[in-house]
Amino acid sequence: MEIRAGEGRDGTAELPSGTLLARCDGRPATALGRPAVVVDRTLDDATAAGIAIAASDGCAAGAVDEATGLLQAAGLTVYVIDDAPGLVVTRTVAMLANGAVDARHKGVASAADIDTAMRLGTNYPLGPLAWGQRWGPATVLSVLDAMQAWYGDDRYRPSALLRRIAAAGGDLREN
C-alpha cells in the first residue's frame, strides 16, 4: 500500500477525519501522540493480498473504517489487530533479520547460506537478510529499538553488527 495524497516524508498521511495514517516503525499507534492508525509492513506492497492495521487508544471507530476503506480500495484484505509495538509482520521480520545478522556476525554461516537455509527450510519468499535489506537496515534497527524501549526486554536488542551496518548505510547481506 502506498500512501500518496498528502503523504509526508516520514511515510505518514492524514485521513479525511484528521487521524494520522502511518506505516509501522515499531512503535504502537498510541505512542504516536495523536489519534492514529498504524499499517503493518508487507514483503511487497504491490503484491500483498492482506494487511494488518491497529488504532491508537481513543481513536475514533470512523477512522478505522476510513483506513480500512482506503486499503480495501487498493485491493487488500484488512485485519484489525491490537495496538502493540511492531504489530505482526514488522516485529517478526525485524527479529528474524536481527537473528540472521547475529548468526552471520558469530560465524554460524555466510549471509548467502543463512538466506538460502531460511528460504528452503521454511519456504519463506526471501531469506531474513534479504528481507531486512529490502526494508533497509535503518528501518530494522528503528523497529527493534522501539520495541526494546517499549518492553524493556533484551530479546529485542539489536545486534551490534546491525547497528554498525545501519550507521554505515551498508548491506545486511555483505560479508
What are these regions (language model features)?
Residues M1-P85, R91-N175:
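NAD(P)-dependent Rossmann-like dehydrogenase/reductase catalytic/cofactor-binding core
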